[in-house]
Amino acid sequence: MSKKLVAYFSASGVTAKVAETLAEAIGADIFEIEPKVPYTEVDLNWMDKKARSTIEMNDPASRPEIAVKRDNMKDYDTIFVGFPIWWYVAPSIINTFLESYDLTGKTIIPFATSGGSDIGKTNERLAPSCKGAKLLDGKVFKHSVGHKELAAWVDGLKL
């Protein structure tokens, strides 16, 4: 049995709830991807062209710093990476996270939360950050998803 990690970034707590439920459902360790400079409500105002999140998402080279790295990443074979959908893709802090480790031989599985957006071009944007890893297709979940649905999704991946 491979060792699994659920790593997630959550701006509002919704993705954190789904990540915790997923980790419990599949018996995985959990790790929160925290920005070195926390996002404020003003930073997250997607309607403001000068908001931090808007500026980051409009710059493909943007890599927001992460507060803490996971020390034992080498111990994991499978990494579920969770995040809210921003502008139809993963927030750029997810690229920062993925690029911070040697992912050679690991399986990366994105999962996202959104009130209405689909996964969009997430994998296309994440693939360059997953060098040497197998990147599986991601899935979007509503905040109300339960253990049973998450466990069934993971079973269907045939890891």
Residue ranges and their predicted role:
Residues M1-T78, Y88-A90, N95-E99, K148-L159:
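N-terminal beta1-alpha1-beta2 submodule of the flavodoxin-like/Rossmannoid cofactor-binding fold
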Residues I26-A28, K106, A133-K134:
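A structural micro-motif
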Residues M73, E99-G105, S129-C130:
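Short, conserved loop/helix-junction motifs that constitute active-site signature segments
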Residues F83-P84:
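Glycine-rich, N-terminal phosphate-binding loop of Rossmann-like dinucleotide-binding domains
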Residues W87-Y88, G116:
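Acidic catalytic loop of the alpha/beta-hydrolase fold
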Residues I109-V145:
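Short, glycine-/small-residue-rich phosphate/pyrophosphate-handling segment
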